[in-house]
């Protein structure tokens, strides 16, 4: 049972960074709804599995960090702000075009709690960042494929599997910093060269979005 719970928790945590590659063409907003529904479902499975795992093994229980009470305070403030807003229902649930309401924020909080409780070593965080960077590289290469006509869309402004050039720019910007962080911590020239190549691909892709991610 414990092995199954560990597989669900770690598998789900490392599956989330791959979601930018997922597009659900059967939905009305294929670039938004598919990713968000998948994110919510995965987080709920991961969180439920983590609760059971933490009850049976103390090492998976959360350690104190100011990030969690700060994030929790934000949730409380946002709850009352949404409740007292002009459109509380939309504030809580958002819509299918954006899907960024309070429900999504709660799921992000749950994901953060599990990440902080389970990824407790530098090696695990390194694996996680490398997974995210690998996904970003695939997203970038797909976007460059759009420019060359290999894939549809994004000929003028690269949007890749995100469907929005502005979102693509922000996504690239974050991962440029992730790559820089990994390069600075690298101890071999081979790895530094590899990170530099990946970083250049991401920077070039960022420029091809036509925006700067701000």
Where are these regions (language model features)?
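Internal metal/ion-chelating core segments
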Residues: 173-175, 180-182, 203
